[in-house]
């Protein structure tokens, strides 16, 4: 199978300045995603033709990626029209696919995007997403989710006409009775290349999708300095106490 791994990170960031090129527990944040790729290639990728690209307009991020010799990465400079706040990431991944096909003179069977700001991901999570996409070729994308701690039928509310009410009106009296919901954690996406080319980006995730479930720590987003500090506390515990997370940290830390 021909797999294209994409890493996408722009220079600008509203919440945490330059977060894509920052250190996380004294290791460059992007190296955790690269460690996932390296471990996948070592453990499961012997029969696959795997390429990796970085799509960015950040020179510091380019330099960090170039320092890792274990994972050869082709750098795609992000065009200005794809670097704005309102540009959907799917458009950037499509740009990566088109330019990778030109650079490597081949078509890919799957595009796997690993979010740079998701360091709490294991190689097994990556394998699960790729395997699910292989098992279900009819779906257009398999993405990662985590169990939701709140449920719109039971304990989520909205403001309406000056009052608060349940997000979805219901007669459920316990959370266990309500339909199960998941958080899209934006960590892993395994795409069909044809869907990237042909599906409307603004409604891409409204239909024909499947998901793999990750540990619920994977719902943390780095959108503020407080998020950044809190995630490092949680990550330190996981890297020290859980083997599947520890191997990712060990691999990333070995490149220092």
Regions found by a protein language model. Name each.
Residues 3-4, 110-112:
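Structural motif
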């Amino acid at each position: 199978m021909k797999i294209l791994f994409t890493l996408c990170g722009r220079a600008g960031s509203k919440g945490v300045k330059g977060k894509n090129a920052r250190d996380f527990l004294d290791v460059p944040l992007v190296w955790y995603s690269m460690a996932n790729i390296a471990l996948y290639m070592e453990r499961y990728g012997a029969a696959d033709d795997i390429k990796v690209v970085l799509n960015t307009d950040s020179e510091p991020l380019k330099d960090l990626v170039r320092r890792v010799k274990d994972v050869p990465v082709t750098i795609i400079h992000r065009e200005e029209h794809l670097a704005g706040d309102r540009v959907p990431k799917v458009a950037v991944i499509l740009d990566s696919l088109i330019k990778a096909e030109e650079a490597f003179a081949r078509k890919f069977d799957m595009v796997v995007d690993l979010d740079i700001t998701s360091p709490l991901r294991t190689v097994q999570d990556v394998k699960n997403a790729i395997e699910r996409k292989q098992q279900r070729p009819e779906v257009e994308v398999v993405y990662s989710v985590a169990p939701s701690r709140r449920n719109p039928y039971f304990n989520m509310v909205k403001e309406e006409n000056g009052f608060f009410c349940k997000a979805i009106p219901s007669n459920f009296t316990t959370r266990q009775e309500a339909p199960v919901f998941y958080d899209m954690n934006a960590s892993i996406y395994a795409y069909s290349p044809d869907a990237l080319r042909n599906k409307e980006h603004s409604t891409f995730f409204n239909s024909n999708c499947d998901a793999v479930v990750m540990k619920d720590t994977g719902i943390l987003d780095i959108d503020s300095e407080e998020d950044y500090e809190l995630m490092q506390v949680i990550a330190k515990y996981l890297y020290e106490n859980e083997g599947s997370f520890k191997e990712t940290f060990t691999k990333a830390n070995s490149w220092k």
